[in-house]
Amino acid sequence: MRYRLAWLLHSALPSTFRSVLGARLPPSERLCGFQKKTYSKMNNPAIKRIGHHIIKSHEDKREYRGLELANGIKVLLVSDPTTDKSSAALDVHIGSLSDPPNIAGLSHFCEHMLFLGTKKYPKENEYSQFLSEHAGSSNAFTSGEHTNYYFDVSHEHLEGALDRFAQFFLCPLFDESCKDREVNAVDSEHEKNVMNDAWRLFQLEKATGNPKHPFSKFGTGNKYTLETRPNQEGIDVRQELLKFHSTYYSSNLMAICVLGRESLDDLTNLVVKLFSEVENKNVPLPEFPEHPFQEEHLKQLYKIVPIKDIRNLYVTFPIPDLQKYYKSNPGHYLGHLIGHEGPGSLLSELKSKGWVNTLVGGQKEGARGFMFFIINVDLTEEGLLHVEDIILHMFQYIQKLRAEGPQEWVFQECKDLNAVAFRFKDKERPRGYTSKIAGILHYYPLEEVLTAEYLLEEFRPDLIEMVLDKLRPENVRVAIVSKSFEGKTDRTEEWYGTQYKQEAIPDEVIKKWQNADLNGKFKLPMKNEFIPTNFEILSLEKEATPYPSLIKDTAMSKLWFKQDDKFFLPKACLNFEFFSPFAYVDPLHCNMAYLYLELLKDSLNEYAYAAELAGLSYDLQNTIYGMYLSVKGYNDKQPILLKKIIEKMATFEIDEKRFEIIKEAYMRSLNNFRAEQPHQHAMYYLRLLMTEVAWTKDELKEALDDVTLPRLKAFIPQLLSRLHIEALLHGNITKQAALGIMQMVEDTLIEHAHTKPLLPSQLVRYREVQLPDRGWFVYQQRNEVHNNCGIEIYYQTDMQSTSENMFLELFCQIISEPCFNTLRTKEQLGYIVFSGPRRANGIQGLRFIIQSEKPPHYLESRVEAFLITMEKSIEDMTEEAFQKHIQALAIRRLDKPKKLSAECAKYWGEIISQQYNFDRDNIEVAYLKTLTKEDIIKFYKEMLAVDAPRRHKVSVHVLAREMDSCPVVGEFPCQNDINLSQAPALPQPEVIQNMTEFKRGLPLFPLVKPHINFMAAKL
């Protein structure tokens, strides 16, 4: 695939050509800017410039205005009278590249500290509490060049939130006690990443360049860099924070995006009032004209040992900063070709040789002044033995591009694809939208900020050739990641401990690559037949319903249909679940269902890639009930792709070589689960404990040896022999077309796979374990990789119903912010602290998830202590405060989906849970508004208090790798620490030694009854 900006270097942490833009409409008809109100800068000396003509999509109904304040802050205002949430973001064009050399992570630490009190609002959780009480949320991130802060809040409370937010940049406190505690949060955040291959590889890339270049810095920071070493060197970190903020948090390096229901004039006045006082220190914009990879860092090979059993090849070329060429984007053009996955592509040839599975290519951001061009592949076992040959093929393909020269029709196709994507772009959630815009305001003229990353305007063959000229063997760096290098390395990266070996690439290998000749198997892509040409929005049918309606109900299928009446874009979502009793009957069958679909997707890749480029994607995966298929995007060519997928499903022939490769990759992925985070392990074990049937990773690994090619070939017709299909077709589609699509799916399966219907008795869902009253169970396991503990504590409450859902959700709303403030900010238990509802198979409860260096039984005691404090907090809560929480939860629940796929996902969730409560939000919010404080206190005392008669609790304790054992319960007196509330004395829990025996001894809940009476709903 073409490398996209969101994709990191490493996997985490995808001519006579007809125009599709309405016969090349003039710009005034394709795109439009607003100038509905004439707001003159003469009205206010705080405004230096106003940009009225923000170019936007014709489909975008929001109003925009750009501002440059007198102090240099760039602003984009977005007036959206329909938004449920308002949002704002501020991006400071400073990041970890500007950290002082002796305090690594200071910019990141500064980001953390700004949340913890300001002169105007000194209470350290004032900002988060205000947002929580008004259905809001916030976050921030620090990168090499940016520190980005953002929030959302109910639309009525934008001004209050923005006022608190603005103080971050005017007068933060950097309180000493907060500083001492928050350094632990940064350290915990780093500790979470230490055994993560994505973070390790990123830091190693930085560490193997010029050590004097800012790119080489350790950006996250940890306790050593932010406390221990500064103390040793006599550095006052609080003073350094104040100095960093006063130096770099300058208005001329800031950009703001604000989105609200208010008019543009009101938004203008609000921003001017709150941000015009931010001081302009005229800080020069940091630029890095020298590339971190100089001649001595090129023609180098790095052999790297990963934590997980992965095999990757990273080929990197230093290139100049191409940012200023955004209107022609030569990196995009080359990434499109080198990263192509169709017939004749580089990936196609490498896969045919059995050397790689995936490929990503394209430009990668560095910082102002430098970039990289990357070609990354996932290696097979055979591919690891042919790295030189793989890179030779890369240079053969690059040579093909040189020989062909820049092709204007390819550029035109990219231009048209991007223009369609921009014109029919889905509406984003406000928080993500403002954060992104604030970040890119630094790079583009105000008028072009919405279009710059989409619209291509100038075909510049000279720039394409300039970048192509950088993709040469003498300009290359190569990194190979494989467990096979264990014990063969001689270097260790400082911050993450990554083991690696550095070697110069031999001259004869460089010469071999330089002499790469043309490979006749490489071809430029064919013209993309999936680019949509019909963008007609269909008229709403007379019988259109506000929610999905059942338009077909037979022994073979249930078809739900909903014509889009909200978004009016030429898109649709087609969701199918194929129920089969053979898909999950045992670990062997689960493995075979997985491999069948992985091989199927692998064989479809060349065909479906063109559709993906044209905005039409599909997802296919095995589930515990069978198979799930979704096809999303422009509806014009959607049936063509769907038909191809179903035909392939029904007639699939397995390629033996790909079978062995994908089976081996699957085994590695099962083994790699051991290296997931402790909190993820805790969630995994809890699911195994609570679900009636769930196969473990170990059971799947053991059964995988029994999956042979003949056995898998025999399994596929068995899987397809009897099915029940439940589908939701939703979007720019008619009822008749939906029925036709469903008939095509059924006919194809019947014709090629001789599929017959399932019996109704075979459509029963799995159920959830029912915990006994006053029961407390503990399950303990150890994580072999990470040096942190993880815990999930689950208080099972009851079956889902309108009343039970609202009791639980309102309680979660009330405790959410205090939980974070108490357990993370004040007690510093760890970076990951979460509370909220857990729902599975119609059963629900309250859960806490924590990852920490502290032992699980201590975390358990702190959660219990916190719950006791919340009982008093709720009892003492004023009616006004209680009603704020009800209103906040109501706003969250009634927050409208921003795009078709999000609305479809809500409806699909109702269908696959077999609850079918499509109007759930309105029904439950109406009930929510009747609740009283006494209802919640009663819910707590009955279900959650230590002595509650209907308390049902299970805890999963995941021990750190260096812990051999740990008590499941303990007492931790807090008299010596006045900041800690006293934990209750806990009874001795029942320790689960065997999952099967645990489940065998307990009853199961019944399934939740559907909201719809299907006998009445039948046509």
Curated annotation (Swiss-Prot):
Binding site for Zn(2+): H108, H112, E189
One Pfam family linked to the record: Peptidase_M16_C
GO biological process, one term: protein catabolic process
Activity regulation, short description: Activated by ATP, other nucleotide triphosphates and small peptides. Inhibited by bacitracin.
Motif (SlyX motif): 853-858
Signal peptide annotation: none
Binding site for ATP: R429, D895, K896, P897, K898, K899, L900, S901
Cofactor(s) essential for the protein: Zn(2+)
Domain of life of the native organism: Eukaryota
Cofactor note: Binds 1 zinc ion per subunit.
Gene Ontology CC, one term: cytosol
UniProt free text on domains: The SlyX motif may be involved in the non-conventional secretion of the protein.
Function: Plays a role in the cellular breakdown of insulin, APP peptides, IAPP peptides, natriuretic peptides, glucagon, bradykinin, kallidin, and other peptides, and thereby plays a role in intercellular peptide signaling. Substrate binding induces important conformation changes, making it possible to bind and degrade larger substrates, such as insulin. Contributes to the regulation of peptide hormone signaling cascades and regulation of blood glucose homeostasis via its role in the degradation of insulin, glucagon and IAPP.
Alphabetized PANTHER family for the sequence: INSULIN-DEGRADING ENZYME-RELATED, NARDILYSIN
Protein name: Insulin-degrading enzyme
UniProt organism field: Bos taurus (Bovine)
Gene name of the record: IDE
